[in-house]
Amino acid sequence: RGGARFFHRDLSLAAFFRRVLEEGQNDRLPLLERLKFLAILSSNLDEFFMVRVPRLKEKRDAPQSIDREGLSFGQVLSEVRRRVIELTDLQAECLTSEIIPALRARGVDVADLRDLDEEESDSVERYFESQIGPVLTAQAVDPTHPFPYISNGSLNIGLFVRAELPAKVAKTMGVGCEEFFVSIEIPSFLPRFVPVEGSEHKYVPIEQVITANIAKIAPAAKESDCHLFRRTRDAAIELRESESVELVERLKEHIKAGRLGGVER
């Protein structure tokens, strides 16, 4: 009956994710197959954090927080976190040091915006002004505006902006400027990589294009203050057998509540 006879379900999933990563690292596979496996890993981790991690947190906070393998759920969460950080670090290293250079050698260039020549930079700026800038909205957090809703899985740019206060307010508060957080959600209908005009297969990441033009969205902002972030929300649903007849209603409730699920990553 010893715990050593069992593998913990969530740690087993983490081990499976490692196998997916290893396929992406396998240089004997075709290049696009390797890239696909790296993408599958990201998708698997999203689902894991939306479904499994919220349940682990619930069990960690329950009075009986030891599983049949003899581990506390707090220990499991810590080990999951350690493994996921290791996986994503290795995934990023594989992508940047192997996949992207190999794509470039085959004529598909995912370039850094700073490496473009003047003509290419101008074309990307025009693309921003016509296709990207008009659909972006900067949402500030201040005493009159709560933290904005961040969609599950969306890409966002966050930054702190310093703004001069009116003279009367500055005198009352004893400070000349105020710092506040600004969030910009990148709409999912925009391309993840922006095509460079004049080159058939050259692209730059959309976040680089936005941050290079950040002052056009938030005039007091600086490119160096921008950080890309992404939220993964709790999307798990629990159905008990006795509720099966109310499945449709339960699903409707879950879909409505899911938009505001707790932040898991």
Language-model segments: residues:
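N-terminal non-catalytic structural scaffold regions of very large proteins
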Residues: 1-265
